[in-house]
């Protein structure tokens, strides 16, 4: 909590995992010597960036973008990208932490990551969503790739789920 004092969602995830492994962990002093808990609880990398895009009225909008690369011990980072107004760094660190464990259980060589933005596609035109996603990816692309980080879809990814086509979208 001292390292990440304003991230309650992340604290919750870490505390839940640590409480379930505590008994087994305490049987192995070599885990402590290897600083396993701290290495597991601190993400490898966190990218935080501004996403600037233009809405249908020509106004410049700004959102925050994030990618948490939590752990790649068994393979490239793998995890979804979420677009929702509630997205913040604490939530994405929580989800990346969980994703690391989920992916390890698949037996596929994938680490854990998660990304997203506080952008909400709800109420936006398809063109606005497209402009936002293009701006988001222009920032994110340099940190991902098949051997490094493989994003996937998550909440809010898929413009047709939240918008209905208007006549201006069809032309």
Predicted regions: what they are:
Residues 1-161:
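Metallocofactor- and cofactor-centric catalytic cores in central/energy metabolism, strongly enriched
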Residues 162-171:
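Single conserved hydrophobic/aromatic residue that forms the stacking wall/gate
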């Amino acid at each position: 909590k001292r390292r990440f004092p304003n991230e309650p969602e992340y604290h919750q995830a870490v505390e839940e995992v640590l409480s379930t492994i505590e008994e087994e962990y305490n049987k192995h002093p070599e885990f402590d010597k290897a600083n396993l808990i701290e290495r597991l609880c601190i993400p490898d990398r966190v990218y935080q960036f501004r996403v600037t895009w233009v809405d249908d009225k020509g106004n410049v909008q700004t959102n925050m973008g994030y990618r948490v690369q939590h752990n790649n011990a068994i393979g490239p980072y793998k995890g979804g990208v979420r677009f929702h107004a509630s997205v913040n760094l604490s939530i994405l660190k929580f989800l990346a932490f969980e994703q690391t464990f989920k992916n390890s259980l698949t037996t596929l060589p994938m680490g854990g990551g998660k990304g997203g933005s506080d952008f909400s596609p709800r109420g936006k035109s398809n063109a606005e969503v497209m402009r936002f996603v293009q701006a988001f990816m222009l920032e994110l692309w340099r940190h991902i790739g098949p051997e490094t980080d493989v994003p996937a879809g998550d909440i809010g990814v898929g413009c047709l789920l939240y918008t209905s086509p208007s006549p201006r979208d069809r032309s």
